């Protein structure tokens, strides 16, 4: 029984680390969204299942990729593709912050906002677990 628990835990840890890597890539590369990775993983899911990878590990990859993506997706919009000074007012707030020298502060506040949203959503996970039962 304990071996089955360790087997599942090892797959979830591997999925977590793989998802963190994929989320970092999708968050840093402009135009490469986390939904693309989720779609690719869902398309490859039958092959992954036939290789013995549990469905919970595939779901763990998707969830961890999405979580890391939310923390990092502000960085390219704040630090890349900055317009000229006369165009900055008509574009994204991240560009205005970059031109005024406050891009690092904007990235930090975006990460804090993502972290706060994550912490505030944790009680909802408990409610969903109670509402849907132990076997999600």
Q: Where would I find each of the regions flagged by the language model?
A:
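Hydrophobic/aromatic residues within the transmembrane alpha-helices of Major Facilitator Superfamily
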Residues: 25-28, 67, 71, 115, ...
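Membrane-interface alpha-helices at helix entry/exit sites of multi-pass transporters
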Residues: 52-56, 96-113
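Helix-loop-helix hairpins and the membrane-proximal interhelical loops
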Residues: 1-55, 134-136
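Membrane-embedded alpha-helical modules
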Residues: 109-136
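Alpha-helical transmembrane segments of multi-pass membrane proteins, especially transporters
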Residues: 11, 15, 35-42, 57-65, ...
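Flexible loop linkers connecting adjacent transmembrane helices
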Residues: 78-106
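C-terminal ends of transmembrane helices
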Residues: 22-25, 73-77, 95
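Juxtamembrane transmembrane-helix boundary signature
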Residues: 29, 64-89
